[in-house]
Amino acid sequence: MPESTNTIINSSVKKIKLSALCELCHGRKAVMKRPKNLMKLCKECFYNIFETEIHNTIISNDLFYRGEKIAIGASGGKDSTVLASILKTLNERYDYGLNLVLLSIDEGIKGYRDDSLATVKRNQKQYDMPLEIVSYKDLYNWSMDEIVACAGIRSSCTYCGVLRRQALDRGAEKLGIKHVVTGHNADDVAETVLMNLLRGDVARLESSTNIMTTSAGSPIKRSKPFKYTYQKEIVLYAHYKKLDYFSTECTYAPEAFRGTARELLKSLESIRPSCIMDIIYSGEHLVLAPKKQKRKTVAYKNKNKNKKKSNSEQEEQEKQEQEVNPDGSISLNRNGIKKDGNTCEKCGYLSSNKICKACMLLNGLEINRAKVTIDNNSAIDGAAKLTKKLEQLSF
């Protein structure tokens, strides 16, 4: 073969090899295109960028302080598994000085949560972290399978969302922890922004886009270190690191409104890859400027019309002043209904209202319990499937 021909072949091979190299280190073979910016990276460079970005998010938002005890909301899924792995790595690498604990919620979904908890228990040994499991059955005397059998599958996420948030708070309080971190990622935040906009619930944008939030009346704060991290990158990190996680979707998730928002987000992302971050930034800027507004009652307005009233009468009317919170709830003083920091009259847990949301939902279930006959555990096991089939029938 002529020398010139060999030169052409060798140069073309060299070009192919150069195009397959990592765009960051230019020394190792690229194994992926980063979803966030389509950059070709090798595994080592991807690990470094992924971990460094999360470290920068933690530092820039002052999420933790030295010596703080942190509960990691662990479900066994990819997000919480990667979160536990990353926090352990960063805690050791940058000497955060954190005391990390795994906190899991057992909703009582047979064939799903029992398998995922087995993954969490393996993670406990792998990461050498304490594990606390809190169950719906112990806290509320209801499992999610029983709730679905009573209320229907379409209401499952409404009940589970409220009960899970309170269960996380109670589990953290039991451990003496004031800070819970969750694996909510950029896709989750963008989906929540879309859901709130589609429902016309602009008041909830602040809590859905904040990296750190608290529940009304609760001293437990929650943070999202993965707020700016794409779900695809979390999956890639778990895959290349060969992390042990549970990948099955919740039995009741397909019926949730979030699934509709997720499909919409995927369609938008296929057209504009940056739409996830764009939606998050839009949600942050769409937050209502006044965090709290004063809404005057009729009695309070009448006070200004009659200036001859005594000071004592005026003070009495001021007690009727209502404060509207960002989430749309109303906090009254002790002579009204409730004030932030008080407790639910039924369960005794912290609540800004007379009766907490969890107790209101559970009370409705108790009323309907008599209408549902559950013979044994096997009937409960198939309750979700039976309910789903019945709801698909048309008469």
From Swiss-Prot:
GO terms for molecular function: nucleotidyltransferase activity; tRNA binding; tRNA-uridine 2-sulfurtransferase activity. Residues 297-309 have a biased composition (Basic residues). One of its GO terms (biological process) is tRNA thio-modification. Residues 297-335 are annotated as: Disordered. Keywords: Cytoplasm, RNA-binding, Transferase, tRNA processing, tRNA-binding. It is an enzyme of class 2 (transferase). It comes from the Eukaryota. One of its GO terms (cellular component) is cytosolic tRNA wobble base thiouridylase complex. Pathway: tRNA modification; 5-methoxycarbonylmethyl-2-thiouridine-tRNA biosynthesis. It is found in: Cytoplasm. InterPro entries: CTU1-like_ATP-bd (IPR056369), CTU1_C (IPR032442), Ncs6/Tuc1/Ctu1 (IPR000541), Rossmann-like_a/b/a_fold (IPR014729), TilS/TtcA_N (IPR011063), tRNA_thiolation_TtcA_Ctu1 (IPR035107), UPF0021_CS (IPR020554). Gene3D superfamilies: HUPs. Its main location: cytoplasm. Its EC number is 2.7.7.-. Plays a central role in 2-thiolation of mcm(5)S(2)U at tRNA wobble positions of tRNA(Lys), tRNA(Glu) and tRNA(Gln). Directly binds tRNAs and probably acts by catalyzing adenylation of tRNAs, an intermediate required for 2-thiolation. It is unclear whether it acts as a sulfurtransferase that transfers sulfur from thiocarboxylated URM1 onto the uridine of tRNAs at wobble position. Prior mcm(5) tRNA modification by the elongator complex is required for 2-thiolation. May also be involved in protein urmylation. Belongs to the TtcA family. CTU1/NCS6/ATPBD3 subfamily. This is Cytoplasmic tRNA 2-thiolation protein 1. The gene is NCS6.
